[in-house]
Amino acid sequence: MRQSIFFMPTLKETPADAVAKSHQVMLRGGYIRQVTAGVYSYLPLGYKVLRKTEKIIEEEMANAGVVEMIMPHMLPASMWEESGRLPKYGPEMFRLKDRHGREMLLGPTHEETFTDVVAKSLKSYKQMPLQLYQIQTKFRDENRPRFGLLRGREFVMLDGYSFAASQEQLDKQFDDEKAAYLKIFKRTGVEVRPVIADSGTMGGKNSIEFQAPAAVGEDTIATNASGTYAANLEMAVSVDTFKQEPEELKAMEKVATPGCDSIDKLAEFLQVPATRIVKSVLYIVDEKKKVLVLIRADKEVNEVKLTHLLDCDSLRVAETSDLEELTGAGKGGVGPVNADWADEIVADKTVKGLYNVVVGAGESDAQFINANLDRDFKADRFADLRVANEGEPDPVDHEPLKFTTSIEVGHIFKLGTYYTETMGAKFLDQNGKSQPVIMGSYGIGVTRLLSAVVEQHATENGVAWPKEIAPFGIHIIQMKMKDEIQSKLAEDLEAKFAKYDVLYDDRNERPGVKFNDADLVGAPIRITVGRDAADGIVEVKRPGDDQAQKLAVADLEDFIANELD
């Protein structure tokens, strides 16, 4: 490809609103252009990277026995009503009506659509296992689109779905998809960590995220040094090392605590450590159930874990008005003693083994001291409900947890029968008995993956693309376009190495302009044809090299084959 005819509108200055490095590089290099907030055009350079990435996905999916198809972008809302997900998705769903007033939506994901097809087609266990996928543009009405392709309102995604007649089949499908995803990420050059994750609105109980460490990441992952534990912070578990020595139970006593509207103020006023205070947090669950959560005051409630425990669609911390109406106490005064108004009391495991603690007295500006579990208050059940902290021991090898910001580039789920039971996807088993199909769901954010690659492979002046997804494998730069010897050599090299996808800079531009643009193209090999062309010598530079090296043209073939084959 001749650069003189290749549409690559580069920018000299970094746009002020581009915060992420990947966003800056893609704008400056002419990979993408914003159409509106969260919506981008993929210019030729960006589209080449996108298509090469999709080709890798297609190859690895085929190797894993996953079959490609395509579903419509516009879906009937009735399908999402049937699955029960429509009210859960909230304002991120793009909704519209057709001319007949029928509710429609733009698909953010396609579990319902695939399940509907399968429900009408799969009738016997003999038709399974089955694995399908598509690569398609998705839509989400993000409240704050940002960081370029990392959080957009329109994006390209691989979404796949598996259908099994048994749990054993699903387990194998899940493992096969995980292995295929790791191969995809390796070939695209992105470092990822598979981590324990929350399934969110997708349904199901078991899921793994593929997280790419990056400074601009919106997620945080918790890992240990030996690599035996990795989890999204939302689901991370740590070992609580605090232990209170057993002591004689004292008589519970109510004390006034005026102005103590925080744990720090309360601890200072009563001259006790936060570890001797049990805070009570009232949650309104699914807008009807009142659940009081107890946790040691030096810890914070993990609401994702709480959602899993309660198996609810929504929860929120009660407003001050709710507290006053239900308990007669304002913020800080709510407590578990005589809390008959609560539908359920759940406690974090940190509450066990505490003696003579401070709890809310059920009225404003008052606390009970020397309160004790079982004697003075109770909990209906205990669970790990706390946010893990960096440095705490992991639950596997008891090594200190390390927190890293990261980008979620993939997510796989064991959905079970979450969708198939509600949507009637059943089959006849070997005994002729009707059973719900067992599902898995699998996704890669393809355009987000491109941003993650740039975040990890950014250079001082551009990007060093991994060889399999680089827009061009070789970038030939001719220094003087009027020099016939240089032109002849550059054209010969372009033809000889055409299979590596060559970009030939044949523009009448200053060397500085050409080299600056070359940094943004980020080809694995840059060949400069200059003053030594008459002697059969060129300069070769890889993105990681400090300086270019001179190389005889006769040695180029072996050098390039070693780098790119």
Curated annotation (Swiss-Prot):
One of its GO terms (biological process) is prolyl-tRNA aminoacylation. It is found in: Cytoplasm. GO terms for cellular component: cytosol. One of its GO terms (molecular function) is aminoacyl-tRNA deacylase activity. It comes from the Bacteria. Its EC number is 6.1.1.15. Gene3D superfamilies: Anticodon-binding domain (3.40.50.800), Bira Bifunctional Protein, Domain 2 (3.30.930.10). Keywords: Aminoacyl-tRNA synthetase, ATP-binding, Cytoplasm, Ligase, Nucleotide-binding, Protein biosynthesis. SUPFAM superfamilies: Class II aaRS ABD-related (SSF52954), Class II aaRS and biotin synthetases (SSF55681), YbaK/ProRS associated domain (SSF55826). Signal peptide: none annotated. It holds the Pfam family tRNA-synt_2b. Disulfide bonds: none annotated. It is an enzyme of class 6 (ligase). Catalyzes the attachment of proline to tRNA(Pro) in a two-step reaction: proline is first activated by ATP to form Pro-AMP and then transferred to the acceptor end of tRNA(Pro). As ProRS can inadvertently accommodate and process non-cognate amino acids such as alanine and cysteine, to avoid such errors it has two additional distinct editing activities against alanine. One activity is designated as 'pretransfer' editing and involves the tRNA(Pro)-independent hydrolysis of activated Ala-AMP. Consists of three domains: the N-terminal catalytic domain, the editing domain and the C-terminal anticodon-binding domain. Homodimer. Belongs to the class-II aminoacyl-tRNA synthetase family. ProS type 1 subfamily. This is Proline--tRNA ligase. It comes from Lactobacillus delbrueckii subsp. bulgaricus (strain ATCC BAA-365 / Lb-18). The gene is proS.
